[in-house]
Regions:
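Rossmann-fold NAD(P)-dependent oxidoreductase module
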Residues: 1-5
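Adenosine-nucleotide cofactor-binding segment
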Residues: 8-63, 120
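Short catalytic-loop micro-motif centered on adjacent basic/acidic residues
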Residues: 15, 53-56, 76-79, 104, ...
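Short beta->alpha linker loops
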Residues: 17-18, 38-39, 58-59, 83, ...
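Glycine-rich phosphate-binding loop and adjacent beta-alpha segment
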Residues: 26, 62-130, 163-165
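Conserved beta-strand scaffold positions in the cores of enzyme catalytic domains, especially
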Residues: 34, 102-104, 138
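C-terminal hydrophobic helical "lid"/dimerization subdomain
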Residues: 116-165
Length: 165
């Protein structure tokens, strides 16, 4: 969902994925460029070449640390996931020499009033041109356990709606 939202606010979006067959799908959602995460040299220096204006990181771990070292001056990084690890290995250099900001996103504890305000903003002000084309599927709650392996193996693209009825 990050690619269409960023595209809606007129930023050039580079989507990064480890799924080699996802390029056309991500470009359809608004990515100007698609790069393979597995081909990125994460480096180990306190500051690497400044590449990104900002980042939305779903993975955490080494990738999040790399983003802190490669975001351009005054860029923001939104950390929204931890699938690649809980640890963050970096220095203070990106924060004090480049003014990079790291924003932790906790969507679970958001008060109801703020949640409604944010969803209204997304629905009315940040509508991406291809939002209806985000891949999605619906499964019954009873089928959830058998669906998990595909997620663990990285074979799922898009969103899954669990029907509780």
């Amino acid at each position: 969902r990050s690619a269409p939202t960023a595209a809606a606010v007129r930023k050039a979006v580079t989507a990064m994925t480890s799924k080699t067959d996802a390029g056309d799908y991500l470009r359809m959602l608004g990515a100007a460029e698609v790069v393979n995460l597995r081909e990125q040299e994460l480096g180990t220096r306190p500051l690497e070449k400044a590449i990104w204006a900002g980042a939305i990181d779903n993975l955490g771990g080494d990738i999040l640390g790399w983003f802190t070292r490669t975001v351009q001056p005054y860029g923001n990084i939104a950390s929204i996931g931890l699938a690649a690890g809980l640890e963050l290995s970096t220095t203070v250099m990106p924060f004090i020499l480049r003014g990079v900001s790291l924003l932790g996103i906790n969507s679970v504890e958001v008060p109801r009033d703020l949640r409604i305000e944010v969803w209204n903003r997304i629905a009315n002000d940040l509508v991406a041109p291809h939002i209806d084309q985000i891949a999605h599927r619906e499964i019954a709650l009873a089928d959830l356990a058998e669906a998990f392996p595909a997620y663990v193996e990285g074979r799922v693209t898009g969103r899954t709606i669990v029907n509780l009825a």
